[in-house]
Amino acid sequence: MHALGRTLALMLLIFITILVPESSCSVKGREEIPPDDSFPFSDDNIFPDGVGVTMEIEIITPVSVQIGIKAQLFCHPSPSKEATLRIWEITPRDWPSCRLPYRAELQQISKKICTERGTTRVPAHHQSSDLPIKSMALKHDGHYSCRIETTDGIFQERHSIQVPGENRTVVCEAIASKPAMQILWTPDEDCVTKSKSHNDTMIVRSKCHREKNNGHSVFCFISHLTDNWILSMEQNRGTTSILPSLLSILYVKLAVTVLIVGFAFFQKRNYFSSRDLVFMKERRSKRSVWQREALG
């Protein structure tokens, strides 16, 4: 019955919000890099074999762009007027890379070469080598490189775009009778768990910061002497409350407890009723014997 009392005292509150990692800065500078097979644009159909080229790379400090605004990424003119090919390489943080070739003879960005949907779309018959983004979203967070092939060499300009979103935090809180509950996370990242005592109850609160919002579920494991719980939450749904589910569990346990207590009460009542009945029969039997003895 003591364990049942602890179960009745159990209350769980769990909620989830979303957190995006802080912005970071890269170094600005220029350097020469020889051609490498591992470079994403070293395709034979774009750069013929045996051609010695010089790479000039300019790394731009990351730019923070708010969600929902319109953006335009510029591909600056090359030192030479003989720019025959320009290619945008888009590498979102949570998507595979995508290429957008700009053909000088066509004066428009050709059909994109992508391995996954969800990347930047270019309007049909776009007459500029600049890359427009109609409405910035979290999926546009990543690196954008404009690569130019000229008679003087190959030039590349890089943009690092950061799209801050809402806070991405997962919190699991449990309130129960002593001893304190144990809370574990999967996956376990940057988590801090604190507990405090209030009268005969213990409040345990665990908070985890997620560096990436990949949409995968986060599991909170809650362990107590009375029972164990496994709660699943999805990061990409924003604020989520599973209190109705927990209330359903508590209602079921309360109903079971009431049935057990009621059954025990009726059993005890039947026991005392039977004992009283036997006692009354014995008293009546003894009284009859006394009356017979008195008459005899």
From Swiss-Prot:
Keywords tagged on the record: Disulfide bond, Glycoprotein, Immunoglobulin domain, Membrane, Repeat, Signal, Transmembrane, Transmembrane helix
Primary localization: membrane
One GO CC term, this protein: external side of plasma membrane
Ranges of the Cytoplasmic topological domain: 267-296
Ig-like C2-type domain: residues covered: 151-232
InterPro entries listed in its UniProt record: CD200R, Ig-like_dom, Ig-like_fold
Membrane topology, from the record: Single-pass type I membrane protein
Residues of this chain annotated as glycosylated in UniProt: N167, N199
Subcellular location(s) of the protein: Membrane
Transmembrane segments: 246-266
Keyword Nucleotide-binding: no
Chain ranges of the Ig-like V-type domain: 48-162
Signal peptide from the UniProt entry: 1-25
Biological processes, Gene Ontology terms: regulation of neuroinflammatory response
Disulfide bridge map: C75-C146, C172-C220
Extracellular side: 26-245
Tissue: Expressed in uterus and bone marrow-derived mast cells (at protein level). Expressed in uterus, spleen, bone marrow-derived dendritic, basophil and mast cells. Expressed in the lung of N.brasiliensis-infected mice. Weakly expressed in brain, testis, lung and thymus.
Family statement: Belongs to the CD200R family.
PANTHER family xref list: CELL SURFACE GLYCOPROTEIN CD200 RECEPTOR 2, CELL SURFACE GLYCOPROTEIN OX2 RECEPTOR PRECURSOR
Assembly behavior: Isoform 3 interacts with TYROBP. Isoform 8 does not interact with TYROBP.
Function: According to PubMed:15187158 isoform 4 is a receptor for the CD200 cell surface glycoprotein. According to PubMed:16081818 isoform 4 is not a receptor for the CD200/OX2 cell surface glycoprotein. Isoform 1, isoform 2 and isoform 3 are involved in the recruitment or surface expression of the TYROBP receptor. Isoform 6, isoform 7 and isoform 8 are not involved in the recruitment or surface expression of the TYROBP receptor.
Protein's recorded name: Cell surface glycoprotein CD200 receptor 3
Organism: Mus musculus
Gene: Cd200r3
